[in-house]
Amino acid sequence: MNLYRRYGWELTLAALLVLEILLFGLSNSRMLDINVLLFSTSDFICIGIVALPLTMVIVSGGIDISFGSTIGLCAIFLGIVFQAGVPMSVAIPLTVLVGALCGLINAGLILYTGVNPLVITLGTLYLFGGSALLLSGLSGATGYEGIGGFPAAFTDFANQTLFGLPIPLVIFMLCVLLFWLLMHRTHSGRHVFLIGQSSRVARYSALPIARTLCMLYAMTGVASAIAAILLVSYFGSARSDLGASFLMPAITAVVLGGANIYGGSGSILGTALAVLLVGYLQQGLQMIGTPNQISSALSGALLILVVVGRSISLHRHLIYEWLQRRRSRKASA
C-alpha cells in the first residue's frame, strides 16, 4: 500500500506502457519482438536524455524551451570543429562545454533580469537556432546533408550494443539513475523541490537559489550536447535541425510523467516511463500505417486525457465534497 501511495502514478504509467505494447502487438506482431522494442528506442531515446534534467528545471518552477536549438547548435559545432581538423577526442568535450555554456546563458539571463524563464528561453531558442543556421551556412553545409565524413568509430558508436542493449538506451538508463539519485537523494534535489514550491520562502531560508538554477540549466545544456553527439553519430551527419522536433515530445513526457508545470513536484522515474510511453506510441502508430498528422494528434489527445485524469485524481476529495453538497441541497429542496 505504501509503495502504491508513493509510486502510484509511476505504476500506472508502467501498466499503460505494457497495455500499449500489447494492443499494438495485436495489430502488428513485430511490436511484441523484444529486439524491435529495444532497437526502436534509438529513434526517440535522445528526447528522454534531455527530458530528465528538464524535469528538474520544471520542478524548480522554471522552464527551458531552447534545448532543441541547443542540440542543433552543438551538432553543427561538432561538425565544424571536426572539419577544422580537431580530433574527435577533443571535439566531443568542447561540444559538451558549448552545451553547458548555453545552459548557463539561460540561467544568467533569468537570474539577472528576473524575467519569466519562458520568455528568456524563447529568446535563446531563436538565438541558438539562428547561430546554428549561421554556422551551418558559413561551413557550407547544405540542407539535409549537413556535415559528414566522421570517423567510422564515431558513426558506429550510437549503433553498437552493450550487454545486448543499444548504446543510446544504456546512456539513457545511466542518466535516469544519475538524475534520480540527484533529485531524490541529495540536498541539491531537496533544494529544487523547495524552490519550486515557494521561491520566496526558499530565498528567506537562505537556500542557494542562484547556484541551484545555474546547475539545473547547465545540466539541461549538457544533456542537449550529449543528445546532439548521439544524434550525429546515429545519423552520420551534423545538421542544425537535429533537435527541431524535440520540444513538444520532451515537455509532453515531463508533464505526463507527473511534473507540475508550475513547479514543486515531479518524478524522474515518471518522466522516464512517459518517454517510453510516448515513444512507443509513435512507433506503434507508424507500424500500423497511421499518418504522422494523426499520430501527433493522438499524442496530444493522450496528454490531455492523462493530465485531466491526474487532475481529477489529485482533487477527488474536493470533487466528492462538491457532489455531497449538491445532493444535500437537492434533498433539502
Curated annotation (Swiss-Prot):
Keywords: Cell inner membrane, Cell membrane, Membrane, Transmembrane, Transmembrane helix, Transport. It is found in: Cell inner membrane. GO terms for molecular function: transmembrane transporter activity. The lineage of its organism: Bacteria, Pseudomonadati, Pseudomonadota, Gammaproteobacteria, Enterobacterales. PANTHER family: ABC TRANSPORTER PERMEASE PROTEIN YPHD-RELATED-RELATED, AUTOINDUCER 2 IMPORT SYSTEM PERMEASE PROTEIN LSRD. The complex is composed of two ATP-binding proteins (LsrA), two transmembrane proteins (LsrC and LsrD) and a solute-binding protein (LsrB). GO terms for cellular component: plasma membrane. The chain crosses the membrane at residues 7-27, 45-65, 67-87, 90-110, 118-138, 162-182, 212-232, 240-260, 261-281, 288-308. The keyword Membrane applies. It is a multi-pass membrane protein. Part of the ABC transporter complex LsrABCD involved in autoinducer 2 (AI-2) import. Probably responsible for the translocation of the substrate across the membrane. Belongs to the binding-protein-dependent transport system permease family. AraH/RbsC subfamily. InterPro entries: ABC_transp_permease. It comes from the Bacteria. This is Autoinducer 2 import system permease protein LsrD. It holds the Pfam family BPD_transp_2.
